[in-house]
């Protein structure tokens, strides 16, 4: 029997973590026993050689017709409407990666009453989505898998004491860097967007990684990446990192204040025993955040209830 079709959209004009995760789910759907994923690039979408679709030689379809099911994320609901497709007649998988849809003033809020099976990237986000009282359909949680390049910068090359990932909060990052430099620590500050490979290479040179999220994140990947490249982590709470980031167990979780962050970094730099204990625990747990685990969880949903709806 021919597989049913599920439509994915690519409408981003630049690379982001959310964009990469959409690509991962497309690849997962290729392993489905019941569905064939189709990809459509909207006008203006990034098709440059560096994006994951191009790197894996995945070409989009030229013309959109109504599929058997939809995989939607972010504002894809609006895009589908602009394409003139009757989305209400087909089952929808809706990937939710942030808290925007829980804000009554955000356009994503108005999509919650639409029927869909929603996949949230953390338990905290799933709880917030349910608490809106607006959601129509099941709400599932699949924590993201992490994919790191096979080759990273050797740790023996020009190591530093502290790496600060501050692209989401440059002001606090610069203040933390200043506070640490006064304590004779070698600091590398990353307060802007850089190539992912370069970011991981710079991260992998550090003994301690400070990661500065937004106040709320659906899921926060940088602490897991840091653990996998061998850096102990200091990171404030952002709700979506609570599954992995547990104070004194896998990392240190200070208040989101410059002084508190500096104190935690100094503590790890001065206490090798603590730093290595946290790093070992974090690295062991980080290794469970695999794309294979994410894929298995997704296919249980896609080839389960959703598949049953389409083939009735």
Descriptions of predicted regions:
Residues 274-288, 297:
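A short, well-ordered alpha-helix in the C-terminal region of glycosyltransferases
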Residues 44-115, 124:
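Extended catalytic core of nucleotide-activated donor transferases of GT-like folds
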Residues 18-25, 128-131, 138-199:
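Conserved catalytic-core segment of nucleotide-activated headgroup transferases in glycan assembly
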Residues 291-312:
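C-terminal alpha-helical cap of glycosyltransferases
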Residues 211-222, 238, 242-243:
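Nucleotide-sugar-dependent
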Residues 200, 223-228, 242-243:
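Short alpha-helical segment that forms part of, or immediately flanks, the ligand-binding pocket
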Residues 247-259, 266-273:
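Conserved acidic donor-binding segment of nucleotide-sugar-dependent glycosyltransferases
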Residues 232-235:
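Short hydrophobic beta-strand element within catalytic cores of glycosyltransferases
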């Amino acid at each position: 029997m021919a597989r049913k079709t599920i439509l994915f959209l690519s409408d981003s004009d630049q690379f982001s973590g959310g964009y990469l995760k959409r690509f991962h789910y497309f690849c997962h759907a290729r392993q489905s026993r019941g569905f064939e994923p189709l990809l459509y690039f909207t006008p203006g979408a990034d098709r440059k050689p560096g994006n994951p679709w191009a790197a894996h030689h995945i070409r989009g379809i030229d013309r959109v017709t109504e599929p058997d099911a939809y995989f939607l994320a972010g504002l894809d609901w609006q895009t589908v409407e602009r394409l003139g497709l009757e989305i209400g007649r087909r089952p929808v998988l809706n990937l939710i990666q942030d808290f925007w849809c829980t804000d009554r003033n955000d356009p994503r809020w108005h999509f919650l009453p639409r029927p869909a099976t929603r996949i949230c990237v953390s338990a905290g986000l799933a709880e917030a989505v349910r608490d809106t009282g607006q959601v129509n359909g099941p709400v599932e949680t699949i924590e993201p898998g992490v994919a790191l390049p096979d080759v990273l910068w050797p740790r023996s090359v020009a190591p530093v004491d502290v790496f600060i990932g501050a692209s989401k909060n440059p002001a606090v990052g610069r203040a933390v860097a200043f506070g640490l430099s006064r304590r004779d620590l070698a600091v590398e500050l990353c307060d802007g967007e850089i190539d992912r490979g370069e970011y991981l290479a710079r991260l992998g040179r550090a003994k301690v990684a400070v990661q500065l999220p937004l106040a709320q994140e659906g899921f926060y990947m940088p602490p897991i990446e840091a653990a996998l490249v061998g850096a102990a982590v200091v990171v404030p709470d952002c709700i979506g990192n609570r599954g992995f980031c547990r104070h004194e167990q896998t990392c240190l979780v200070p208040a989101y204040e410059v002084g508190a962050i500096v104190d935690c970094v100094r503590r790890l730099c001065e206490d090798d025993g603590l730093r290595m204990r946290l790093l070992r625990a974090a690295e062991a747990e980080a290794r469970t955040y695999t794309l294979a685990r994410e894929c298995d969880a997704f296919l249980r949903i896609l080839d389960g209830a959703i598949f049953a709806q389409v083939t009735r």
